[in-house]
């Protein structure tokens, strides 16, 4: 029965393909006939499924048949009242959450380490941000989650806060206390929005933390492509309850969605939903088991520290995210990531002291076991060449910032570039992040300080890529023109 779960859009696309219709319509490559030879060879028969928006296949802007049914099935699968497909990734879904929940000038309470895409939503919506500093985990040198006490205090002090945004789980798999926070938000008549980019697999097994929807969130943005079987840039926005206007959410999603959505991308969302609907529990178990093999491998090396739930201050951990700290061996995360890449293993994230491996249900093949063997070979070599331990410096923690101007105001202000060292005391005119994880170090409108410059220089020296500024080398930074 599981294999007979409906995939409405895919079934409609296959039906259209079987009719052998000659396409005197877009796209211009005409079912692959005109596509560059090498690309066509690599893509294979799938190019015939790259079809145009037409009534036979439904319209994501006005869904009435196959897309409507597929999105309804996704909502049923996750237990929401409505699901909206996002073909511009979770960034689009986050923007839609903010524009649905808040009007211009209203306040959003959020952690300062929210993903950089949130800043774009604040600009689009003219929303005022009220930031909270997440708790810090000194042994791994990473930011964790904001607490219910912080949120309770902020909501009690400012009745103009209309919504709260969480990132849960965070990049490292640490889940916030979403249920308690949801209760707190609703008691203060605020809606709870969750960036659940790294949690589309939650809610299908007790081996993992519960999902945001199960914990009472009003909406969540999920990266179906990050953890499940959808193609890159495919995500979902889930909405539940009466606190958000579903029609407004639909209108916002339509505004933010291209009028030429790729049907292969949407088909992959349909397929990923069907897969997790049928096998979600088995997929979760497979991922947890595969991650456990990697955890055991790394933990067997003296000095390496693998993040466990006990390191999370009472919060739950998605154990399919495997964070390994190499400070005791004297290696930075960047260096270790490069060593693994030389051994033909690419990791999800590196930072000053850690490497993050992302394990999913797909890591059950002999290829995965071979990758584990290559990881072990690298670790054996590193163990024989251990260095003096690294001291987890305070510089590992992003310095606190001070907002001087609203993001939207800065977006429309004139800016000029100055050498980074000369920007102290100036108002930043652009976003500065190191990606991944894409957490802004500086946001437009914030004051540039010596501490922030020192932090940025330290991250550059580690070799972490800069994201956001016009000058990607960060030799210069744009500030508000005097």
Label each region the model flagged:
Residues 342, 348-482:
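PLP-dependent enzyme catalytic core of the Aspartate aminotransferase-like
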Residues 246-250, 268-277, 315-320, 349-355, ...:
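Short acidic (Asp/Glu) and glycine-rich catalytic loops that position anionic groups and cofactors
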Residues 170, 328, 361-365:
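A generic structural motif
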Residues 9-14, 20, 38-40, 62, ...:
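Conserved PLP-enzyme active-site core in the AAT-like
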Residues 282-356, 383-399:
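Conserved small-domain helix->loop->beta segment predominantly found in fold-type I
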Residues 238, 325, 358-360:
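Short hydrophobic/aromatic beta-strand micro-patches
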Residues 47-90:
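Conserved N-terminal alpha-helix of the aminotransferase class I/II PLP-enzyme fold
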Residues 1-65, 437:
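N-terminal "arm"/small-domain region of PLP-dependent enzymes with the aminotransferase-like
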């Amino acid at each position: 029965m599981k294999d007979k779960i409906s995939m409405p859009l895919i079934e409609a696309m296959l039906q259209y393909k079987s009719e052998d219709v000659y396409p005197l319509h877009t796209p211009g490559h005409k079912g692959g006939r005109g596509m560059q030879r090498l690309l066509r060879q690599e893509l294979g028969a799938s190019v015939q499924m790259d079809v145009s928006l037409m009534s036979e296949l439904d319209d994501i802007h006005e869904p009435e048949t196959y897309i409507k049914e597929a999105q309804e099935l996704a909502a049923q699968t996750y237990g929401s009242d409505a699901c909206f497909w996002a073909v511009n990734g979770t960034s689009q879904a986050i923007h839609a959450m903010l524009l649905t929940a808040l009007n211009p000038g209203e306040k959003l309470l959020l952690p300062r380490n929210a993903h950089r895409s949130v800043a774009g939503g604040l600009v689009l919506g003219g929303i005022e941000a009220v930031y909270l500093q997440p708790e810090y985990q000194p042994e791994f040198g990473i930011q964790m989650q904001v607490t219910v006490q912080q949120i309770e205090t902020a909501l009690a002090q400012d009745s103009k806060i209309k919504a709260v945004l969480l990132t849960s789980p965070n990049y490292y798999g640490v889940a916030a206390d979403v249920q308690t926070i949801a209760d707190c938000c609703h008691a203060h008549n605020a809606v709870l929005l969750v960036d659940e980019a790294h949690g589309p697999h939650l809610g299908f097994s007790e081996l993992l933390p519960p999902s945001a929807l199960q914990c009472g969130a009003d909406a969540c943005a999920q990266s179906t492509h990050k953890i499940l079987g959808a193609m890159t840039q495919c995500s979902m926005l889930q909405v539940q309850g009466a606190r958000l206007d579903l029609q407004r959410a639909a209108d916002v999603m339509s505004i933010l969605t291209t009028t030429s959505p790729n049907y292969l991308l949407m088909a992959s969302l349909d397929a990923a939903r069907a897969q997790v609907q049928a096998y979600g529990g088995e997929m979760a178990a497979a991922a947890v088991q595969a991650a456990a093999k990697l955890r055991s491998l790394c933990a067997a090396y003296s000095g390496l520290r693998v993040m466990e739930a006990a390191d999370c201050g009472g919060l739950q951990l998605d154990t399919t995210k495997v964070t390994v700290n190499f400070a005791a061996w004297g290696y930075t995360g960047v260096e270790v990531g490069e060593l693994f890449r030389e051994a033909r293993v690419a990791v999800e994230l590196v930072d000053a002291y850690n490497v993050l491996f992302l394990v999913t249900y797909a890591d059950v093949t002999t290829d995965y076991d071979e990758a584990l063997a290559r990881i072990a070979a690298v670790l054996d070599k590193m163990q024989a060449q251990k260095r003096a331990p690294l001291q987890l410096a305070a510089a590992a923690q992003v310095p606190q910032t001070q907002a001087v101007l609203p993001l939207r105001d800065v977006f429309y202000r004139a800016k000029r570039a100055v050498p980074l060292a000369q920007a102290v005391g100036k108002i930043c005119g652009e976003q500065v992040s190191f990606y991944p994880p894409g957490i802004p170090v500086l946001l437009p409108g914030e004051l540039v300080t010596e501490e922030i410059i020192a932090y940025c220089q330290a991250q550059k020296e580690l070799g972490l890529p800069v994201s956001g500024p016009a000058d990607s080398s960060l030799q210069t930074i744009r500030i508000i023109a005097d």
